[in-house]
């Protein structure tokens, strides 16, 4: 990731990938054919782009650490997601991912790291790289670990009700089936309130 030398603070939307941009499946999304964008996500992200936000993905990709897929596979899928979004007026400014898996990882990947959410090492790196304004930036994710990560870096987390969640092998998560106009407007209104503070 190229570091920005611009001294201007940027509004950023930090966003999880699997389950927030593309549909979460019970396995791992490491091939292009696994990727199905959540309906309405293109509209949501294009609205943030129009408002001058940098769109930055922060994602756990522990399947690398388990030996299920490679770094190259993650880059291929990330480029594909970016391509799909750019065809619809959106796009990703930066991808940050953690390959580690403390529980099921092998070799050098079986570590308790600070970059795997809820750790915030990657988020802090992205904040630095993009000169993010913590006060006007926000984090959107489907997993409780996303909220914990955002909290550690003093980034506002869009208030998802995690009381009615699915418990999965990858944590407590809500299922975002689509970004309806009402949900998009709610997220945009939340972001706007941050800009007024």
PLM feature spans:
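Active-site neighborhood of HAD-like aspartate-dependent phosphohydrolases
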Residues: 2-56
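Acidic active-site catalytic centers that drive phospho-/nucleotidyl reactions
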Residues: 16-18, 60, 142, 146
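Metal-dependent phosphoesterase signature
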Residues: 21-39, 64-73, 87-90, 106-114
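Short, solvent-exposed coil/turn elements at secondary-structure transition points
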Residues: 27, 98-101, 163
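Asp-based, Mg2+/Mn2+-dependent phosphohydrolase catalytic module
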Residues: 2-8, 72, 79-93, 103-139, ...
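Substrate-recognition element of Asp-dependent hydrolases with the DxDx(T/V) motif
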Residues: 41, 45-84, 90-101
């Amino acid at each position: 990731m190229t570091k920005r030398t611009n001294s201007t603070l940027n509004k950023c939307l930090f966003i999880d990938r699997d389950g927030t941009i593309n549909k979460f499946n019970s396995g791992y999304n490491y091939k292009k054919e696994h990727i199905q964008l959540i309906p309405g996500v293109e509209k949501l992200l294009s609205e943030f782009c129009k408002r001058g936000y940098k769109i930055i993905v922060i994602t756990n990709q522990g399947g690398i650490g388990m030996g299920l897929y490679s770094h190259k596979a993650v880059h291929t899928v990330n480029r594909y997601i970016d391509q799909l979004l750019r065809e619809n007026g959106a796009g990703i400014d930066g991808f940050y991912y953690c390959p580690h898996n403390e529980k099921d990882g092998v070799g050098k990947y079986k570590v308790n790291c600070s970059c795997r959410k809820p750790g915030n090492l990657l988020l802090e790196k992205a904040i630095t790289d993009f000169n993010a304004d913590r006060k006007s930036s926000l984090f959107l994710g489907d997993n409780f670990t996303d909220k914990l990560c955002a909290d550690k870096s003093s980034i506002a987390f869009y208030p998802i009700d995690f009381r009615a969640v699915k418990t999965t092998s990858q944590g407590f998560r809500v299922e975002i089936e689509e970004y309806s106009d009402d949900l998009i407007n709610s997220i945009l209104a939340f972001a706007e309130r941050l800009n007024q503070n």
